[in-house]
Amino acid sequence: MNLKFIPVVSLVLCSCQTAQTTDPSLLTFKIPDGSTLSLNKNLEIPDNKTHAALQYGELTTDRKKDDYKLNCRFDIKSFGPKTIKPEVFKIHRTVDGQEWISEEANILRFYTDVFLQSDKGTDVIKLTCQEQGDNSDRAFVVSEMETTLGDYFTFTFPATKPAE
């Protein structure tokens, strides 16, 4: 066995690793521990619903939203009608993923679940942002989520320490 190739193979494998970034417009950005999501104004949960839907920076309904464009839903435990007042929620976990809606029609659902905690007792569960596409599409980035949420919500990410 030729041992000359071990350093070369090691270098190639290490270069495949993606670095964590602090830029929410990049696909490699992950919402860091210690982040928060601020609700900036009253959010209305409709009658007989446990969520509010947002798209293009505005409240919408499940019937009116375009599943092929990025949309978000803010989920709570109890049924509306209900008004959620401005509050800062702690983000305790995020999950990014994709799943087949229809393999025959080649439709994928790209999603990010942002699990939330309230210090004020609000019965919040999570914020889910999602869009449908096909296998030639890419997942969305956090900055696109911010645009979809408009002025209703704001993410705050903790300051990161510079690399030493």
Describe each region flagged by the PLM.
Residues 2-9:
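Sec-dependent signal peptide recognition
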Residues 13-15:
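C-terminal motif of bacterial Sec signal peptides marking the signal peptidase cleavage site
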Residues 17-20:
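Bacterial signal peptide processing site
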Residues 35-64:
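Post-signal-peptide N-terminal segment of Sec-exported extracytoplasmic proteins
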Residues 67-79:
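N-terminal post-signal-peptidase region of extra-cytosolic proteins
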Residues 77-92:
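Short coil-to-beta-strand transition motifs
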Residues 93-103:
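Short, conserved beta-turn/loop elements at beta-strand boundaries and strand-helix junctions
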Residues 121-164:
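C-terminal partner/receptor-binding element of secreted or periplasmic proteins
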